[in-house]
Amino acid sequence: MSDIYEIGEALIGDGPELAHIDLIVGSKQGPVGTAFATNMASMSVGHTPLLSVIRPNLPTKPATLIVPKVTVQNLDDASKIFGPAQTAVGRAVADAVEEEIIPKDIVEDIVLMVNVFIDPSAKDYRKIYQYNYGATKLAIKRAFDKYPSVDKVLAEKDRGTHPIMGFKAMKLWNPPYLQVALDLDNEDRMRSIIRDLPKRERILIEAGTPLVKKFGVEIISKIREERPGAFIIADLKTLDVGRVEVKMAADETADAVAISGLGTNESIEKAIHECSKQGIYSILDMMNVSDIPSKLEELKLKPNIVLLHRNIDSETMRDNDGEQQSEWGNIKDIKSKLGKRGLIAVAGGVTPEKVDTALANGANIIIAGRYIIGSSDVRRAAEDFLRYLPQDSDTMRLALDEDEKI
């Protein structure tokens, strides 16, 4: 077992007594064994490691070192670590051996290092014990099960919300979406509309060009005040100095920036690169671009999203192969230029009755402006679109049921 090196993590409980365990399991002869000895010999003020014991004079097997994550500042803090937390970890390790989570024949060959989180405001020793016992045993099981798998991580990375973070950072992983274009010049009206919009993950909020021109990119932060977890697009229609404008929008917490497809390839690529660097989406607005597929082929860096506008001559439009095009061109052909993760947004006189057609032709994002922001009943107008879209992705999901195999 000289090559064993596994990592486990678990969070259990609620309130100040919440338990968060990080642990490493490894051979005494390997790097974990070295770290174990080093930590015992090199104590840190406020983070003194201690051997896990089930009771005085009875250390658990395999040998386990507990390291407090939060600085121990007084004897009250120390009592929580040396009392309920230490007992919880020791018993969890012993029970993991008894239940054959840890093979009994390797307990003398391996060691565990367990990082324990104890909130200084925690009071209930029973909860400290129970939560840390459960979290430690679960973390051990996860370590030996190699949980989570890479596939699990990729499936969950854009879905979860960290309980301490308090809000969900949206990613466009499960289209379709409705993008509400706030093409306004009045901040009070903007706030009123946002408050009236349904609180749905399917809704994206666009800081329209008039808003940005009148109030600057700071208007993005004002939108964020009204809806902290929203996905916000800054419609800058960037033509030049894209890097500067993208960074300005990103600094105000924009999730995406719209770049004009009329810019030079160099300017567009610089803006797309800056979006990638800032960790936000790039949207290439193809308004008045005559040959969209060719434009995309010319770009070395592709945008995350291409925005297509309705062509008024669409009823007579066909592509080079004679295939009838949608109002927004041959969406499937355009999407093929972006790669499998590329998205298509459509705009231009979109009404609820056109949603099914747009989605059937391959659109991922439906952009609506006047129909919603010009309505006396903003919520109803938005719901006119939303009834054509699926439920929010996790409406019927019981996330905890999907975490562990039985």
Curated annotation (Swiss-Prot):
Region (Formaldehyde-activating enzyme): 1-164
Involved pathway(s): Carbohydrate biosynthesis; D-ribose 5-phosphate biosynthesis
Family: In the N-terminal section; belongs to the formaldehyde-activating enzyme family. In the C-terminal section; belongs to the HPS/KGPDC family. HPS subfamily.
Annotated function: Catalyzes the condensation of formaldehyde with tetrahydromethanopterin (H(4)MPT) to 5,10-methylenetetrahydromethanopterin.
Keyword Lyase: yes
Principal EC category: lyase
Binding site for substrate: 22, 51, 69, 71, 86
Gene Ontology BP terms: 'de novo' pyrimidine nucleobase biosynthetic process; carbohydrate biosynthetic process; L-ascorbic acid catabolic process
Organism: Methanosphaera stadtmanae (strain ATCC 43021 / DSM 3091 / JCM 11832 / MCB-3)
Entry protein name: Bifunctional enzyme Fae/Hps
SUPFAM superfamilies found in the cross-reference section: Ribosomal protein S5 domain 2-like (SSF54211), Ribulose-phoshate binding barrel (SSF51366)
Gene: fae-hps
Keywords assigned by UniProt, alphabetized: Carbohydrate metabolism, Lyase, Multifunctional enzyme
Molecular function via GO: 3-dehydro-L-gulonate-6-phosphate decarboxylase activity; carbon-nitrogen lyase activity; hexulose-6-phosphate synthase activity; hydro-lyase activity; orotidine-5'-phosphate decarboxylase activity
Domain of life: Archaea
Catalytic activities: 5,6,7,8-tetrahydromethanopterin + formaldehyde = 5,10-methylenetetrahydromethanopterin + H2O; D-ribulose 5-phosphate + formaldehyde = D-arabino-hex-3-ulose 6-phosphate
Pfam families: Fae, OMPdecase
InterPro entries: Aldolase_TIM, Fae/Hps, HCHO-activating_enzyme, HCHO-activating_enzyme_sf, HPS/KGPDC, OMPdeCOase_dom, Ribosomal_Su5_D2-typ_SF, RibuloseP-bd_barrel
Region of interest called 3-hexulose-6-phosphate synthase, as start-end residue ranges on this chain: 165-406
EC number per UniProt: 4.2.1.147, 4.1.2.43
Keyword presence, Lyase: yes
Residues annotated as the enzyme's active site: 20
